[in-house]
Amino acid sequence: MAVALGCAIQASLNQGSVFQEYDTDCEVFRQRFRQFQYREAAGPHEAFNKLWELCCQWLKPKMRSKEQILELLVLEQFLTILPTEIETWVREHCPENRERVVSLIEDLQRELEIPEQQVDMHDMLLEELAPVGTAHIPPTMHLESPALQVMGPAQEAPVAEAWIPQAGPPELNYSATGECQNFLDPGYPLPKLDMNFSLENREEPWVKELQDSKEMKQLLDSKIGFEIGIENEEDTSKQKKMETMYPFIVTLEGNALQGPILQKDYVQLENQWETPPEDLQRDLAKLVDQQNPTLGETPENSNLEEPLNPKPHKKKSPGEKPHRCPQCGKCFARKSQLTGHQRIHSGEEPHKCPECGKRFLRSSDLYRHQRLHTGERPYECTVCKKRFTRRSHLIGHQRTHSEEETYKCLECGKSFCHGSSLKRHLKTHTGEKPHRCHNCGKSFSRLTALTLHQRTHTEERPFKCNYCGKSFRQRPSLVIHLRIHTGEKPYKCTHCSKSFRQRAGLIMHQVTHFRGLI
């Protein structure tokens, strides 16, 4: 399989190579791109922008040609279709070019003597791995089809019981009769098969159902062999010693690379009759856990044990914040919140405005900023129909209608709707002007006033009209200008119902109504 695919890849990728440029950082960005989850982002805009950024960091379109990018994509797909162990083995060897990738796989196949198609090594492994004191089941006991072949009473070498284990946790206990107990953990139980029924029992109704069941076919096709036999009393003592040994299980397909190494360790331990070391136990535990046993329901009226229910998934309790920032110790409920918070420490601002080039920490901030260029004001006051770009501005404005003024100046007694307004007002009492222009030395009490002033020196006009292309230094000037194109006149006279684009126009008009009274 891999040889044919390798030849195809080698024939199609014969121009240039990017392996030497494919460093560890590229692999990190590739994994982050493939493993990125939607829940890690605050919304669809941030998720799309993050995927775009990770893809560019991985493929580097500004540095690589289209052919090199295609080569990387084909390489990734080629490694993906390989068996898991071969893919891991190839990545660990860090081949310097594509020819080396193909040759590594071909050398590995020749070393292991694995055909291109599926190989059945069942009998060979049973011969090599059968421990001392065990005997093979006679050919009549080999379960080669879904029909259970049961040894008759006239066999010369009868076996007490035969057990076909499915992959499970690392600890097995064997009774004196060779019965396998506690093979699987409580979360994934494996029913026990009573192999001591007579030929007449095969005619019972549930036997046919068990033979044709999907679960039994999975057991018979699982490519796992493990046989236990007790022939005489002398072998019984060795069998009891084997009960303390860690069981050795090798899958023929999923772990072909790990099998020979573990087999060698097992033979050494078998000769010593000692408890296996912890490192071997961990390797065997990983090997067994990879099988992920799954079985269905137990047939009715059978002597199979009832399986236990799997352990329920642990739910996160309300208010739990498992994600902790290593810099400041602040905790968050979601990983995406922690990711956004860590940008504060790193100073990263990945979201850039295409109009003015200003960068932002979050995509939501960029989206809100772009309203300054488009003039969009989605939040409208239901009382005076005035519109705002931010919800917080609308809430503050609505307080003017409800006459809610919670912030009071202790100097003059004046009240304000916002704390920022009170803070700005206090500077009038102290005369504080902390913001100074470096060009002309003029000082301002507000940073926004300094920003607007500096545009007079730089002649910067960041607010551009999308209709006529005219630019403005301030956003309010753009908003007023846009009303010329839209025909909007939000300021209405309460006396004659005449409307105006600007508030100043309304005030000048209202003077005409009161001119005779003055």
From Swiss-Prot:
Region of interest called Disordered, as start-end residue ranges on this chain: 292-325
Biased segments, Polar residues type: 292-304
A single MF term (Gene Ontology): RNA polymerase II cis-regulatory region sequence-specific DNA binding
InterPro entries: SCAN_dom, SCAN_sf, Znf_C2H2_sf, Znf_C2H2_type
Xref: Pfam families: SCAN (PF02023), zf-C2H2 (PF00096)
Biological processes annotated in GO: regulation of transcription by RNA polymerase II; spermatogonial cell division
Subcellular location: Nucleus
GO CC term (a single one): nucleus
Keywords, in A-Z order: DNA-binding, Metal-binding, Nucleus, Repeat, Transcription, Transcription regulation, Zinc, Zinc-finger
Function: May be involved in transcriptional regulation.
UniProt similarity note: Belongs to the krueppel C2H2-type zinc-finger protein family.
PANTHER family linked to this entry: KRUEPPEL-LIKE TRANSCRIPTION FACTOR (PTHR23235), ZINC FINGER PROTEIN 384 (PTHR23235:SF142)
Name by which UniProt lists this protein: Zinc finger protein 449
Annotated organism of origin: Pan troglodytes (Chimpanzee)
